[in-house]
Amino acid sequence: MKNVMDLQKMLKSAKEMQDRLQKELAVLRIEGSSGGGMVTVVLDGHKALQSIRIEPEVVNKDEVEMLQDLIVAAFNDAAAKVEEALAEKLGGLGAGLKIPGLT
């Protein structure tokens, strides 16, 4: 019976830790950029796009494809930084694990 109670306590603690981490990720802001800062995106800890900043000199109707590539590169840069931040928050524990709702 004691083992069951210990397991329940451990599961409750893990759930509380997950809830706390979810809240931290929601307010986390990570910036990624490309083109030497010509395009910058900001993601939250859940990799949801929060903002995009495009320098006016990049906007050229004849170079739309380049702008699209810069946006994708900036997003990918920020997404990689979110992964790094998450791994750091987890302290290496389970950084390689695919935890639903966290990765």
Task: List PLM regions with ranges.
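Residue-level signature of catalytic and energy-coupling elements of molecular machines
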Residues: 14, 47, 71
